[in-house]
Amino acid sequence: MTDETSGPAEPVTDAPGDAESPAQPKRRLRLLLTVAAVVLFLDVVTKVLAVRLLTPGQPVSIIGDTVTWTLVRNSGAAFSMATGYTWVLTLVATGVVIGIIWMGRRLVSPWWALGLGLILGGATGNLVDRFFRSPGPLRGHVVDFFSVGWWPVFNVADPSVVGGAILLVALSLFGFDFDTVGRRRPGEDAEPSAGASDSTPEAPAADGPDKPAGPVGPEDAAEESKTVGHQAEPS
């Protein structure tokens, strides 16, 4: 006999969050590449203008002698560090760019996409100089043009890389992972260990051989009295 009150089965549909989750890495990758493209564009344009308008060794004052336009050719890393290792820095920067692009395909956090985009744009901007400026490929000198006080001369790419790295460190410290949208829950890492401890079987108590439960008969009582008597005898 069939139940006439039951209606037709409703089709099972995915939740809106499940339908959007596969598209999130693609959107984050687009955000990453957009930020990187903006940084790269600003870096390349400002370097071209600096080379055309500035003369090496002749700073142009912006705020006295504290902030100036100063054209410098840098063979080292950001802020004129590690000079003399140009080809090593070029290979390292190339590896960083490849790693960020590979990681960008799995990004879910928009903040991680922003930080990685800043690093990618800055690293790519300096790589353009490494490959296409004198004295040659892998050995090209980066164009720096902005000087602030005692700080080394830098360009747009340098603070972009440093700012992106600081952002990623802050996100990691505050519990924002690259593969999640929000913060990581504080007890999320402790749950597996707690579950494992609960499932550990308890060891049986070693109290000697088990005796059958039930009423004590005359023979058992006599045996117990003999045992007590032997224990009470002086040694």
From Swiss-Prot:
**Reaction equations catalysed:** Release of signal peptides from bacterial membrane prolipoproteins. Hydrolyzes -Xaa-Yaa-Zaa-|-(S,diacylglyceryl)Cys-, in which Xaa is hydrophobic (preferably Leu), and Yaa (Ala or Ser) and Zaa (Gly or Ala) have small, neutral side chains
**Regions that span the bilayer:** 31-51, 84-104, 108-128, 156-176
**Keywords from the UniProt entry:** Aspartyl protease, Cell membrane, Hydrolase, Membrane, Protease, Transmembrane, Transmembrane helix
| Gene Ontology CC entries for this record | plasma membrane
Amino acid composition bias (Low complexity), ranges on this chain: 201-218
Q: How does it sit in the membrane?
A: Multi-pass membrane protein
Q: Name one Pfam family in it.
A: Peptidase_A8
The protein's location, in the record's own words, is: Cell membrane
Query: Could you say what a knockout of this gene produces?
Result: No processing of prolipoprotein LppX and synthetic prolipoprotein constructs.
| Single GO MF annotation | aspartic-type endopeptidase activity
The lineage's top-level taxon is Bacteria
**Known pathway:** Protein modification; lipoprotein biosynthesis (signal peptide cleavage)
Q: What is its EC number?
A: 3.4.23.36
Q: Is the keyword Hydrolase in the record?
A: yes
InterPro entries, A to Z: Peptidase_A8
Alphabetized PANTHER family for the sequence: LIPOPROTEIN SIGNAL PEPTIDASE (PTHR33695:SF1)
Task: Identify its protein family.
Answer: Belongs to the peptidase A8 family.
Q: What is the protein's name according to its record?
A: Lipoprotein signal peptidase
The species this protein belongs to is Mycolicibacterium smegmatis (strain ATCC 700084 / mc(2)155)
